[in-house]
Amino acid sequence: YAESGASITSPSPRQFLSLRVRMMTDDPQSAAVLRSVRLNFNPPVAQQLQGELDKGVFAELGQPQEVSLFIKPVFAPQDIGFDEILVRTPPDMSLKFSGLRVGSLEQWENDQVEELTDVQVLETRSDSLWLRMDRLVRRGARAELIEVKFTTALFSSGAVLEAATGNSTLDNSWQQVDPADVTDRAESQGLQILASVTDNKVLSDVQVLP
């Protein structure tokens, strides 16, 4: 960050923290000095957050396709939980919300997951999807796997999505979702989308009429 006191977004809790500092001065007779570093931590929303897209390859460029993002949270007893989900794409992509389902692993196996009907889509940029649920996902909430469905189109050879979860009652509580292989219902093993090598044309069936 550029200003003192600005917030940073942390991944899931880590054992170590690495800092890199660049010090500058406008006076050639004076040297910049770093006297102290102070960090203020928010409580984590979860002990671990992992995510995976259901498809890692788009067959056609420029054509909207529905994608599912599966998020698997792991909670410690003291974690505060989350009720917001944020998904980001590169600037040339846009996101349209389709649905959100939550359930325990047993409910997913038995196709008894709950489709949330009262999900707020909060205003943000077109390349982001900011959702607020009507409940808090936390330890014991029978939400071991979450599916966020949205529609998007790919216009390049590939894109990496970013996801985070947050608690609406706490400022700057966003916590990063790490890419991983979280469920057999998805095949991407991460948060990357690639264009098909067999058909990666943005334009097709182009005709020039007199």
Predicted region positions:
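Beta-strand-rich ligand- or partner-binding modules
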Residues: 1-209
